[in-house]
Amino acid sequence: MKCFHKIINSSSADLSFIPDGSVQLIVTSPPYPMIEMWDEIFFAQNPEIREDFQREDYTAAYRKMHDILNRAWEECHRVLSDNGFVCINIGDATRTLGKEFRLFPNHAAIIDFFL
C-alpha cells in the first residue's frame, strides 16, 4: 500500500477537494466557542451570534458557534476513512458574562456530534 503525507493549512469546513473516505488522520485546532479572543471570528461567520451576545442570550450564541464547527466536523467525517482518527485540540470555556460565571463544555458538544 502506498502511503503519503500531506499537511493542509485551511478551514476544515470545506474539504471538497479531498475524496470521501481517503484520510486516515485529521489534526485540527479550531477556534474555541465562548473564549473571548475568538468571538470576532464567530461573529464574522454568523452575525446572529453578535446579536445573541447583545441580548445576553449566551446559550444561543454557544449553540450557533457549535453549528459553525459542526460544518467542519461533517467534512472531517466525510473524508475520514473507516479506520481513521480525528484529533481535535479544544478546551472547555469558562467565562464571566454579566455577573455570572459560566462553564461552556465544548468537549461535550463535539462528542455529541460524533456519537
Regions found by a protein language model. Name each.
Residues M1-L115:
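S-adenosyl-L-methionine-dependent nucleic acid methyltransferase catalytic domains
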